[in-house]
């Protein structure tokens, strides 16, 4: 049967092992390894053992698509864990749903991960273990308005990231609803390292604070 080789059941790990978000993938793999070890030690699968087959997304959506195809077609895994980046989960989702193989993302928060934005139909083989962008954006807007007491916001996002776009959208909607004003919106690209000119432009708009829904490398 698919994913079963004798006494071994193969699970796919579609993870960011290299690239800009490698910290997510590496820590995720460590967690999966530990979980599989404990499951195997308990012997809850009737004597069968789980093994992890990893495909590296290289922190790129296109590579996630290739990796999903490999895990399903070549490695014959029974299910896939990952990726962590929303853009990568969305890109690879058509493959696992088409093949009727379950995928679960630990960190893919964009609503489009589990719901087709065009048809509004739930993707039957895509799942997540985390909250979603509407929740995060709403909470951040509430925190900015009610706790920080700020009125003028700048939004600075990674223009290549569905994660960043989703958070920015829901933050803006709720911040404005709370009586705030978004005075400027700017964007950077993944792997950018020089932000001085844009930050100078943002400073000139005189925001009370800057909302940057991005990944750790560029934000740091």
Language-model segment annotations:
Residues 7-10, 47-51, 74-79, 98-103, ...:
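Loop/turn elements at helix/coil->beta-strand transitions in domains of secreted/extracellular proteins
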Residues 23-28, 42-116, 188-195, 217-220:
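Beta-alpha junction/loop-to-helix N-cap segments that form part of ligand/metal-binding clefts
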Residues 17, 121-190, 209:
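An alpha-beta-alpha
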Residues 1-10, 41:
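Short, low-complexity disordered leader/linker segments with a strong preference
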């Amino acid at each position: 049967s698919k994913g079963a080789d004798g006494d071994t059941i193969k699970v796919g790990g579609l993870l960011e092992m290299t690239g800009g978000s490698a910290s997510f993938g590496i820590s995720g793999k460590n967690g999966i390894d530990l979980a599989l070890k404990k499951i195997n030690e308990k012997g809850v699968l009737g004597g069968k053992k789980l093994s992890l087959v990893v495909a590296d997304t290289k922190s790129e959506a296109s590579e996630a698509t290739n990796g999903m195809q490999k895990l399903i077609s070549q490695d014959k895994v029974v299910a896939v864990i990952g990726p962590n980046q929303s853009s990568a989960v969305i890109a690879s989702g058509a493959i696992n749903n088409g093949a009727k193989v379950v995928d679960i993302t630990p960190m893919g928060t964009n609503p489009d991960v589990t719901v087709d934005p065009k048809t509004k139909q739930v993707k039957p083989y895509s799942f997540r273990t985390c909250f979603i962008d509407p929740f995060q954006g709403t909470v951040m807007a509430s925190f900015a308005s009610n706790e920080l007491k700020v009125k003028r916001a700048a939004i600075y996002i990674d223009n290549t990231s569905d994660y960043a776009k989703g958070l920015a959208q829901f933050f803006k909607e709720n911040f404005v609803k709370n009586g705030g004003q978004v005075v400027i919106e700017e964007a950077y690209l993944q792997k950018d390292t020089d932000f001085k000119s844009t930050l100078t432009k943002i400073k000139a708009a005189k925001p009370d604070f800057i909302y940057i829904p991005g990944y750790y490398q560029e934000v740091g």
